[in-house]
């Protein structure tokens, strides 16, 4: 299972969006610390294995034992991915510049070229690398997790869980889940 560090303020969004954007969530009153990241997958036949949910919970808590509440936020997706990020690292090029590309080069080599010299575009390129260059179509860095969004773009439901007045869990539902979904436990050694 992969872990990340979250602060008291968290962004749940497609990483292509700048702040503020109407179809993202900025959640305050988060219990800071280490969080476990899980991706739930499902075999969608001709679509292949797809990510149906992203679940991020405070380490030591069991997601199935939490009470999840639907939020009023629509998590819009236009780049085929969404994630949970500590506010201070969101679209922060300086925060992510030491992270290497998975295959040693940008996933956009020979294709789309991010807008150079625009704040957040280097960070966005690294988020795309995590979803485009991994078998899981998902990945983490120290303060965030990003995953491909099921079958693609759309508007998705965000749930949160709280304990003692603090948010301790986030769940993005890509609207594909049912009882046959499989939990993908990432190995920290990847």
Task: State the predicted function of each range.
Residues 1-190:
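Intrinsically disordered, low-complexity acidic regions enriched in Pro/Ser/Thr
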């Amino acid at each position: 299972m992969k872990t990340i560090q979250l602060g008291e303020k968290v962004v749940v969004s497609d990483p292509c969006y700048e702040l503020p954007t109407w179809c993202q969530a900025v959640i305050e009153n988060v219990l800071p610390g280490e969080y476990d990241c899980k991706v739930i997958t499902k075999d969608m036949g001709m679509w292949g294995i797809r990510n149906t949910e992203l679940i991020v919970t405070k380490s030591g808590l069991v997601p199935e034992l939490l009470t999840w509440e639907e939020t009023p936020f629509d998590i819009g997706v236009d780049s085929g991915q969404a994630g949970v990020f500590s506010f201070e690292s969101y679209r922060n090029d300086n925060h992510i510049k030491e992270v290497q590309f998975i295959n040693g080069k940008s996933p956009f080599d020979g294709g789309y070229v991010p807008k150079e010299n625009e704040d957040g575009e280097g960070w966005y390129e690294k988020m795309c690398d995590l979803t485009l260059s991994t078998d899981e179509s998902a990945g983490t860095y120290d303060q965030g997790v990003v995953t491909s969004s099921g079958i693609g773009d759309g508007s998705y439901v965000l749930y949160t869980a709280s304990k003692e007045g603090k948010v301790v869990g986030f769940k993005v539902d890509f609207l594909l889940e049912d009882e046959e979904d499989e939990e993908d436990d990432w190995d920290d050694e990847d």
